[in-house]
Each structure stands twice: as structure tokens, then as C-alpha cells.
Amino acid sequence: MSVGILGAGAFGTALAISLGHTTPVTLWARDAKQAQVMQNTRENTARLPGFALPAGVKVTSNLADLQGCDVLLLAVPAQKLRQFLRGLDQMVAGKTLVTCCKGIELETGMGPVDIAREICPQSEHAILTGPSFANDIAKGLPTALTLACANPDRARQLQQELSNGTLRLYRTSDVIGAQLGGALKNVIAIACGAAIGAQLGESARAALMTRGNAEMQRYAQHKGADASTLSGLSGFGDLVLTCTSELSRNYRFGLALGAGKAFDPATTVEGAATACAVAQEAREKALDMPISSVVAALVENRLDVENAMTKLLSRSLKEE
């Protein structure tokens, strides 16, 4: 099996490094100059410095070079996925598209697999998600992820081909649950970061993580997912990692919000758009999504952290 990776950011590059030791990998970068530099220097100094690309990785900016790949990993931001895939449906027909981004599209409320399936109906679809940082994968540190695919035979094949000595994949057919877990945990991570940034303490973070997990499961069930999927790697596992580490962009964004500091606008923060998409649906369909709604208000500058916590703590008392 040959693998193509669309997106030469930190995560796409890390996957190329991990898989490239045993599998032929073609890594596509949008910028031709960046692709040439990476191909020549064997390093992504802009996005993932300090890690050498294996000999089995070819870097290109020419989409035609991916024609021979059986599997394409889509490592592009969720909010840009639709625009990116437009016009590629014929090129990717018959191939397996594995989305590797985590988010909910603001305009439509759709997840990454839903978007890819709509734009590229002649392809097989899956999602790779779970608790992982690009640096850990590139270093070859033990990492476990969820591979979700509705086709059980294809899921088994992908699991075998993409797993290696340091990257272990667990498969599921619950695509909805897997993509929602990865998206929603980013929202909770912003909330936790804001609490710590505002010096509200570790107890507040623990409460937000626990009630956030319940909120994630509630929303996933509303969308037709199996709630138990949110207790696995793609849900709870990713939640724990993202809410406790400053390597998480969403958590760092929350820290900045809580501390009243500026955050680099060039940094992708998937949880911000996801929070707004979820909050909008919660309003329209009377869903109980208090943390997501508060995060959306924080992101849109309609609420500060102190009032956000007051709003959460003043809700009607209830059974757990």
C-alpha cells in the first residue's frame, strides 16, 4: 500500500515520518518552495523542526504525484477542508480518504468525514483521530489512535497497514462518534485553559473535564453516535491530553483568554469555530450544551471568564 498525505503542517509531517520508515509516502505541500526545501533538506524546519524525513518520504507540491497512492490522509484544517476538496473528486475517486482533522464546520455543522463524503462520493471514507501530538509521533513515542470506518473490511486493512511499532490503531465503525469526540474535546480544552489562565484552580479544570465529557456524550448521542465511543481514545483519551498540556493549541488559546492575553491569529484553533457551531445548534434545537455555549460566548467576546464561570455555577442544581 502506498500512502499520500495532503498537508505538510506539523501533524501531516509527523505522520509521514512515522509511516515513512516502512511504507512509501508522498507528502504534499501547498507551497512549491516549501516542498522543494523539504525534499532537499529532508526536514520541515517551518512546522516541525528537528525531525528528519525518512528516505521513503517524497515531498511534492504537484497533486498529480498522488495519483498512484491507494490511501490519502487529509491533514488540512477542518474549516478549510471543503474548499480544499472541491475539484478533487475525480482524482480521488476509488481511493480511501482518511481525514485527520478535528472540528465541526461552522457554516454547516458537519464533521470532516461528512464533508469529504459529500464532496467525494466515489471514495471510501475513514477518520484517524485520538490523543496525539505531532512531536510525540515524530519522535516515535508510543501513541494509540482510533481509526473509524463504516466498512469493516477496509477498517481492518487500514488498521494493519497504518499501525507500526510505535503507532497503534484501534478500529471502530462509529464514524460519527469518532469525529465528534475529536472535535468537541477542543471546545472543552479551551474552557479548561481559560480556567487555568484565570487562576481558578485545578478543581475547576477537573469539573470542566468531567462535565465536558458528559456534554460530549450527550451531543454525540443526539447526532446518532454510540455514547461509548466517547469513552475511548477518540473522546475521553483525547480530552485528557488536550485539556492538560500546553502543547495543545486549543488549551493555549484558552490560557490566553483566561489571562487576558493576545493569541497568535495565525495559529489554527479548531475548537473556536467548533464551539460556535455547536452553540448555534444548541440554541436552534434546545440542546443542553452549557460549556460549549459559554466557550462560544468567550470566543465571540460576549462574556469574560469570571462571568462565564458564574453562569455555569449558577445553573439549576441537578443529579449527576
From Swiss-Prot:
Q: Which GO terms describe its biological process?
A: carbohydrate metabolic process; glycerol-3-phosphate biosynthetic process; glycerol-3-phosphate catabolic process; glycerophospholipid metabolic process; phospholipid biosynthetic process
One GO cellular component assignment for this chain's record is: cytosol
Recorded hits in SUPFAM superfamilies, A to Z, give: 6-phosphogluconate dehydrogenase C-terminal domain-like (SSF48179), NAD(P)-binding Rossmann-fold domains (SSF51735)
Q: What class of enzyme is it?
A: oxidoreductase
Ligand binding (NADPH): F11, R30, K102, A134, R249, E270
Enumerate the subcellular locations listed in this protein's record, separating them with semicolons: Cytoplasm
Q: Which domain of life is it from?
A: Bacteria
Keywords carried by this UniProt record: Cytoplasm, Lipid biosynthesis, Lipid metabolism, NAD, NADP, Nucleotide-binding, Oxidoreductase, Phospholipid biosynthesis, Phospholipid metabolism
Q: What is its main location?
A: cytoplasm
Its Enzyme Commission number?
1.1.1.94
Residues the record lists as binding sn-glycerol 3-phosphate? K102, G130, S132, K185, D238, S248, R249, N250
Q: What HAMAP family does UniProt report for this protein, alphabetically?
A: NAD_Glyc3P_dehydrog
Family statement drawn from the similarity comment of this UniProt entry: Belongs to the NAD-dependent glycerol-3-phosphate dehydrogenase family.
Q: What is this protein called?
A: Glycerol-3-phosphate dehydrogenase [NAD(P)+]
Organism of origin: Roseobacter denitrificans (strain ATCC 33942 / OCh 114) (Erythrobacter sp. (strain OCh 114))
